[in-house]
Amino acid sequence: MGSSSERRDSVLWSDIPKGPLSAYRARASFNSKELMLFWDGQDVLDFKKTIFSTLENDPLFARPFGADLPLEKERELNFLRCKRVFEYGFFNAEDMLKNPLKILVLMNCLGMYDWSLANKCVLHMLVFGSTIIGSGSEHHFKYLEKIYNLEIFGCFALTELSHGSNTKAMRTTAHYDPATQEFILHSPDFEAAKFWVGNLGKTATHAVVFAQLYTPDGQCRGLHSFLVQIRDPKTLLPMPGVMVGDMGKKLGQNGLDNGFAMFHKVRIPRQNLLDRTGNVTSEGHYHTPFKDVRQRLGASLGSLSSGRISIISISVVNLKLAVIIAIRFSATRRQFGPTDKEEIPVLEYPLQQWRLLPYLAAAYALDHFSKTIFLDLIELQRAGKVGTTVTGRQSSGREIHALASAGKPLASWTAQRGIQECREVVGGHGYLAMNRFGELRNDNDPNCTYEGDNNVLLQQTSNYLLSLLEHPLQDGAHFTSPLKTVNFLEAYPGILGQKFMASSKADWLDSEAPLAAYRWLVCYLLRESHQRYCQEKKSRGSDFEARNNSQVYGCRPLALAFMELTVMQRFHEHTHSSSVPPSLRTVLGRLSMLYGLWCLSQHTALLYRGGYISGEQTGKAMEDAILMLCVQLKDDAVALVDAIAPSDFVLGSPIGRADGELYKNLWAAVLQQSGVLERAAWWPEFTANKSVANRLKSQL
């Protein structure tokens, strides 16, 4: 009879097959199953295994290589799969209330399989449903059961054809009619059509629609959200006054039906206003708990934070999949060697390590951040339910909004660069569609622009940081926040006076070194950005121009540096906590160090310019430390990706399978494609009229 640990392992995950990757696994400094257990916990691992095995054993989820479906069929199949996911009961409300992280886990597991499927489910449950919870009142919660049971299907309609990032300029209107106690939704023209709305194209029956609220006195009360029926759930035909359609084929995620909608004087009950941030009485009087219009708008758009936090996790999953495939490939692909008779795995080359392993470290660091920021958001939503003070929610909401606004750019851009690097790392085989790099690249691409353009979002984070200097709190505590991400700024003047006095590789390998450097960097960029902004405002007299002219070399790098520090700080605390098993401390510590130094190395010029470091040797020592960490992590790389990898079926890449049989798997997949050995159906065109040269030459 096996030990309890062996029995637990067998429940958590299947044994990894023997094969060409076994040599690297044998050299690992830790047990990958122990890392799985620490990283996710048994409950989540069991949940993952259930999801993966369920998908693999259901013929509806089969995906033969090389099969391209017509757009309409792709949309149909994706909805059937979405429906099946709900039929399996994965969205168990009671279970997810006990462990909210399972919501994120489910989204990620489905996304590893197909983001069209995951996003269809997420937009319905996590975005549409969460907006009702976060922005509505108790009388709106009756819709939640209908959402869980798929009696209605939802979407989130904010963006319009002519406006996206500038939410205050949305033009859809909602005039209140006290005579009937209804709001009248209207699109003034086609440019005000709701656009790019996921699920709206073919399937949504209901939408959270953002519109400018007008009271009977003619005043515009700003952007508010309304629950609007779009289609009849029994027929899927549009409701009266609603014009709704599908946008067509996209670069990726074509199973997801993005659509548009216009409203022609559509009447909805007064109760359909999601009234957490503002309400209208039956007589038409407007009430809001917020004194400041901007604060109310921020609270109204708080649901955007959930979407952006979801995108952080989506991006991390894409990065993880690319890194898993590329590292397994690199550990089995042999090219060149010290002699003509010996070839070595390309993972043994320092250049390959330097190209890949920092992205592996980033995948771990950002994965941890995505989980923690998601749980922060859940706590904020719970605080709203139990009646936490408006001031407390505002403070937490502003901080989470700032983190989500910079977290999405950092995660999506890191994934974008990482996927491309991994595609190139595996050479020509990475260009073959069945190996998934093209799909990952296309599916990740919209993460950089939807739910807010990355460069615009970064301005919201820098505005948050600058406000700490511009608007000191009454009690004098300028730099405190509920999540403590800005608390280090209390030492702002002292940090600016610090310098990195050491210059050796060992000095950079001190786990506090990159954190201290990043704290200085954020303080330096905050000071530079504030000074630049003040100078611009003084010379131009316009706050609008001053902020725009402070972005490129000031506010933009400030927001990114602050976000990198936050991710690094959380990862460092996690990997150095007492809960880390002794056998995992070294490898996780190295991942934390590599992520920190790799990110920091991209700011070397600023560190020199600001005087934090000096001398040629200091910068070289940082580079040497990065290369040493890559060498130290090389033998652990395969085990590290094993700990975060899905099943082979879900990974869906012949060159990334766990057995490492690179060439056998790729050859088999190529031969399994439909028609691969058949003569071209258009072969007669090849044989007919052979003498074609110059036949159509111009006679002029």
From Swiss-Prot:
It comes from the Eukaryota. Keywords: FAD, Fatty acid metabolism, Flavoprotein, Lipid metabolism, Oxidoreductase, Peroxisome, Phosphoprotein. The keyword Lipid metabolism applies. Its main location: other. It holds the Pfam family ACOX. A motif (Microbody targeting signal) lies at residues 698-700. Coiled coil: none annotated. It is found in: Peroxisome. One of its GO terms (biological process) is fatty acid beta-oxidation using acyl-CoA oxidase. Oxidizes the CoA-esters of 2-methyl-branched fatty acids. This is Peroxisomal acyl-coenzyme A oxidase 3.
